[in-house]
Every structure is written in structure tokens, then in C-alpha cells.
Amino acid sequence: MARGEAPAAPTLTEVAEMAGVGRATVARTLGGYGSVSAKTREKVLAAAERLGYAQNQLAKSMTTGRTNTIGVVVADVGNPFFAGILSGVAVTARARGYDVLVIGTDEDLAEERRAVETLLGKQVDGIVIASAAGRSQPVPHLESALRRGCPIVLVDRDLDTIDTDAVVTDNRVVTEHSVSRLIESGHRRIGFVWGPVTSQPATDVDDVPKIVADALWSDGERLLGYTDALRRHDLPFDTALVSHSLQTEAQATRAVGGMLDLADPPTAIFATEADAVTGSLRALRKRGLRCPDDVSVIGFDDSSWAEVMDPPMTVVAQPMQALGASAAAAVIERIEGQDRGARRIEVESTLIWRGSVAER
């Protein structure tokens, strides 16, 4: 071998010779198909490891019809919520012998379409996706993937327009419970940050279902939970207490500031995401108000900072890793041929009561 020349990669034949078996036996062992005894499998794997043999995944996929890869599409891979989901997917997939490819979309439907096409081009066996589509919006890119034989499992979102599995949390139930706890603590004016993004906010509670139909499933479910709590306690719906702006921390600060400037301002805020919490707290600070002495706050998603804040933040804790694990298990069931009807798997969230809510 000339100086600087890379050594030749070990071959299937060399693995077979070292293990004392035929090439076909090595191919079956490393390819994960056919019947191989435990003793033979151990010899083949030991020889492959000793030689540093790396299997040709393309050749394997041509033999088995699978790449043993799951594609995952989420809005923001840096968001702690989606990072938790990704962790759950990865752990479950790895335990079942699957690799994971992840693409972020920034909650952009055009980017989502491109992401799905990219994953299909890479021959993934199935896709787990937190879709950016509204709950009643057509999703031809996902329907096309299903027609092409690629299982789809929705995570954190559900859609009325496609017949496939969805793994979600109990957004509506836990929001009603949380807002009801505020009401039972004496609060009658409760701000809601955020509602679904829309240029035509609800003027009364009867408009809410129309807004929800076009919204992300999770956003819509939380708004429905909020209105459920108001109805349950015979409180009026006030559109001025619901933010429908872009979902950024700055917009949350602006929206809550507007609520605090009302003649009858809220005494509590229910914030549906981490940026909504920090934006709400910033609005209070700008006006010299304190949580919970002046305004109580409940947030969504637990984190280390929520517990060490002063006061510690009362939050809805979503089981992010459980969401991801359940979604991965569901798509693997589909990949491996389990034939059943589409189902919604609902994972329970928990209201963690800390120090950011005061009695009125």
C-alpha cells in the first residue's frame, strides 16, 4: 500500500472467513433477516467488529425493503418542548433498531412539505410529524406519503383531514382544570396568552369553534379548555382578554400590557407556552406589578427555571418524552405491519401547583 493511501475496507467475504461461515450467513446475520443460530450470530458479530466491517446500508435496504430509519418533522428542534419529544422518539427508536432523521420547519407549511419530500427521498420507513397545518386544513403532502406506503404518525397535533394515528396531550382537559383552579382561587378576569393566531378574533364565545377549526390543534384545544372553564363557572367570555397575536415573547408582552391597561384588567394570566410566560412577566414588571401579589400566572411546560423563580411558577407539565416515545412506538407498529384503524393516543399532563397564584 502506498504511503497516504487509505487501507481497503474489510469485505463480507473476509468476515465470513474469520467467522468460519458462508457469505450468505454473514449477510443474513448483519442484514437482520432469515434464520441464524445465536452461536453463529455471536461469531459473525465478533468477526465484523474485529475487522471493523461497516455494513452497506443501501445494499441492506435493497434486500430487506427497509432502511430502519424514522423521519421526524418538528417546528423547532431547539425548543425544549420539541427537544423532549425528539429525545423520546430517539430512545424508543434506538431500542427497536431504528435510526432517526430530524428536520425543523419553523412552523412553516411550505418547509414542512419540503421536509416530507426530503425524508421520502431518503427512503425513511415512517414519519413522525408535528404538522404546521390547521386542524381542518387539507394536507396533500401527508396523504401522498401514506399512498406511497410511508406510515405517518402525528405528534402534539391532530388533524381532521387525514386518517392516521395521533399522539397528543390532554390540552383541553388540563387547560379547563387549570383555569378552573384560578377561578376557584377567586379570579374572575383571566387573560389567555396565546389563543390561535388570527386577524379576526372571536367577538363572543360562539365564534371560538370557527377560530379553532383553522388553528393548530394544540392552540385550539387550549382555547376550548379556557372557554369550557368560563362556562362551567358561569363567567362571561371577553375577547379583550384573549391574545391572538403572533406567538413571540415580544407580542406576549404587548398583548398582556394591553390587557393590564383595560378599565377592568385581569387578576390572573394563563400562558400557554414558555415565551408567553416570560412575555407576561415582563409586562407586569414594566408596570411595577408583582406576581402573584398583583397578578397571578400559570404557565405551560415545566422546566428547571420554573421551580427556581421567585415565586416558583405554577405550570402545566407536559410529558414530552412520553409523547415522543409513544409516537415512535406507534409508527414502528405501522412499519412492522400491524394493521388496525387510526387511533388517537392521549397522554395526560399534570398541573404543578407552586407559588405564582394568589387567592383573591
Can you name each region flagged by the protein language model?
Residues 54, 100-121, 241-262:
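Structural motif
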Residues 57, 83-85, 114, 140, ...:
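Generic recognition of short, well-ordered alpha-helical segments
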Residues 50-56, 110, 136, 281:
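Short gly/ser/thr-rich secondary-structure transition/capping motifs
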